[in-house]
Amino acid sequence: FGGAVNMTTASIGTDFSGEASLSYGSYNTNKQAVRISSGLLGDHWVVDARLTHIGSDGYIDRGATDLKSYMFQTGYYNGRTIVKLLSFGGKAKTYLTYNGVTKDEMKYNGRRYNSGGMYRTEDGRYHTIYNSNDGYPEWQKVDYYDDETDNYLQINNQIVVSHRFNDRWALN
């Protein structure tokens, strides 16, 4: 199965512009973004760029995120024809928070408890671990692997060509 969606996210800016934004929230959640556009150059060309960073310590123990993304495009516009070279992508580092938590685990270990990356050791800290044989909680020493993360890097490059023949027909 496959498909395509023809979508315009922003109209062509005729004037130079830029924007910067900063935000901050709970659990050290933060976002920084900067965008710049050349405006129309020589009646035909536009260059746009954007950089974004999002980070958070996360609500769940060891649930931090570190996300970076970029977008760069240059486009040629000539009446009914558009040719754009576009590159976008990002890098993501997310700590593992996939495991669910039972009511008893929350009762003994708190709402933010995360068993991801946990292993038993003699030198670790105490957490309630459930014995699979009898179902009763028992205290055991555990520790957590450092950098138990998912790491992604994605780079996308596209050439987009569009020509409008008339008000009813266009080719992309």
Question: Model-derived features: where do they sit?
Answer:
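Acidic/polar loop-and-plug regions of large Gram-negative outer-membrane beta-barrel proteins
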Residues: 73-75, 82-158, 172
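Short, functional N-terminal and low-complexity linear motifs
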Residues: 1-4, 34-42, 52, 123-128, ...
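Flexible, solvent-exposed coil segments and beta strand-coil junctions
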Residues: 9-17, 46-55, 132-142
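Transmembrane beta-barrel wall of Gram-negative outer-membrane proteins
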Residues: 24-55, 60-99, 104-108, 157-166
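N-terminal periplasmic accessory domains that precede
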Residues: 1-21, 30-38
